[in-house]
């Protein structure tokens, strides 16, 4: 049987909030089977819990933010959620002492390292997957995103930026998902932004913590980071990373194909909401044998059962 997963023990790190510029402490704790991913604001009294579900995503400007009915928010969840999805972690409690997840280096790689360093524990209940049975599509002008039936999890993603450096890179990628492929090919891709936008963002109290330490920065012609890019196609790979994280608020790993053109956080969330609303387009499945599982998650080293 393919089992649910959590972290073996509590792990903690600190970083900077991308938009606030303030120090943030992030704590990840184990959780029982069928808990899902829960986020908690520990800087509030009493602490406020926000479930990581699609209808709690109420802000998608520059990041994905969960916001409850009282306006309490936790922003910039997408890179952490990509790491959780990529490592197949079903259950965890995420605590932060600020309104956003720390940006770290702008990719999912520090979160992958954090989760792998503390260890991943298989649990005693079957892992649940969302199996797509009919196509679901959302559009916004020339942008679109779609989920289609497929035996594994495949991403077919294209971007279209009118910038010479991005235009020179590969702007279309197709990949079949596995934990190893995610860690090797996607997790290190950093968020990117343009110098021309920084003044506007900071005037609106956004990207106050942004720097070349946690983003790829471009002027009108080139990448400004002294060390350049981590991948030749880092731009499209980061958009895929964002999509991994955004789709994980569906609650489970998806068995299907995700196809997208120029999509971002808003359209990704619209797609998840459209899928959940179209209940005849998917079903919850589990797999008795690992060989039958269409989505390949690396078996945790020294896995134990809880």
Curated annotation (Swiss-Prot):
> Which GO BP terms sit in this record?
lipid A biosynthetic process
Query: Active site located where?
Result: 265 (proton donor)
User: To which pathway does this protein belong?
Assistant: Glycolipid biosynthesis; lipid IV(A) biosynthesis; lipid IV(A) from (3R)-3-hydroxytetradecanoyl-[acyl-carrier-protein] and UDP-N-acetyl-alpha-D-glucosamine: step 2/6
Sorted alphabetically, the Gene Ontology cellular component annotations on this record are: membrane
Cofactors (names): Zn(2+)
Record EC number:
3.5.1.108
Q: Does the keyword Acyltransferase apply?
A: no
Q: Read off the Pfam families from this record.
A: LpxC
Q: Which reaction does it catalyse?
A: a UDP-3-O-[(3R)-3-hydroxyacyl]-N-acetyl-alpha-D-glucosamine + H2O = a UDP-3-O-[(3R)-3-hydroxyacyl]-alpha-D-glucosamine + acetate
GO function terms (MF aspect):
metal ion binding; UDP-3-O-acyl-N-acetylglucosamine deacetylase activity
Going by the UniProt record, its keywords in alphabetical order are:
Hydrolase, Lipid A biosynthesis, Lipid biosynthesis, Lipid metabolism, Metal-binding, Zinc
- Please name the InterPro entries in this protein's record: Ribosomal_Su5_D2-typ_SF, UDP-acyl_GlcNac_deAcase, UDP-acyl_GlcNac_deAcase_C, UDP-acyl_N-AcGlcN_deAcase_N
Query: Which principal EC class is assigned to this enzyme?
Result: hydrolase
Which residues take part in binding Zn(2+)? 79, 238, 242
Family matches, as HAMAP family: LpxC
Enumerate the NCBIfam families for this protein: lpxC
| Task performed by this protein | Catalyzes the hydrolysis of UDP-3-O-myristoyl-N-acetylglucosamine to form UDP-3-O-myristoylglucosamine and acetate, the committed step in lipid A biosynthesis.
Which family does this protein fall into? Belongs to the LpxC family.
The protein's name in its UniProt record: UDP-3-O-acyl-N-acetylglucosamine deacetylase
Q: Which organism is it from?
A: Shewanella halifaxensis (strain HAW-EB4)
Q: What gene name does this entry carry?
A: lpxC
């Amino acid at each position: 049987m393919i089992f649910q997963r959590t972290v073996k023990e509590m792990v903690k790190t600190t970083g900077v909030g991308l938009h606030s510029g303030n120090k943030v402490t992030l704590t990840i704790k184990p959780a029982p089977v069928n808990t899902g991913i829960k986020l908690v604001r520990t800087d509030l009294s009493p602490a406020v819990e926000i479930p990581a579900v699609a209808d709690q995503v109420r802000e998608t400007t520059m990041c994905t933010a969960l916001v409850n009915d009282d306006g309490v928010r936790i922003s910039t969840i997408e890179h952490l959620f990509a790491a959780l999805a990529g490592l197949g972690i079903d259950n965890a409690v995420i605590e932060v002492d600020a309104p956003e997840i720390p940006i770290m280096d702008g990719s999912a790689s520090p979160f992958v390292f954090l989760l792998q360093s503390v260890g991943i524990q298989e649990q005693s209940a079957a892992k649940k997957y969302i199996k797509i049975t009919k196509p679901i599509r959302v559009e916004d002008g020339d942008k679109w995103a779609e989920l289609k039936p497929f035996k594994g999890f495949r991403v077919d993603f294209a971007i279209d930026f009118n910038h010479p450096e991005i235009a020179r890179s590969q702007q279309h990628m197709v990949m079949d998902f596995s934990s190893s492929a995610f860690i090797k090919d996607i997790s290190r891709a950093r968020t990117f932004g343009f110098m021309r936008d920084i003044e506007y963002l900071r005037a609106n109290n956004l990207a106050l913590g942004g720097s070349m330490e946690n983003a790829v920065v471009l002027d009108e012609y080139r990448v400004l980071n002294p060390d350049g890019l981590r991948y030749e196609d880092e731009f499209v790979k980061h958009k895929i990373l964002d999509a991994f994280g955004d789709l994980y608020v569906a609650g489970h790993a998806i068995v299907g194909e995700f196809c997208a053109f120029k999509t971002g956080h808003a359209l990704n969330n619209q797609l998840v909401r459209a899928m959940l609303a179209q209940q005849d387009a998917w079903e919850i499945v589990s797999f008795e044998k690992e060989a039958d599982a269409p989505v390949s998650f690396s078996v945790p080293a020294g896995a134990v059962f809880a």
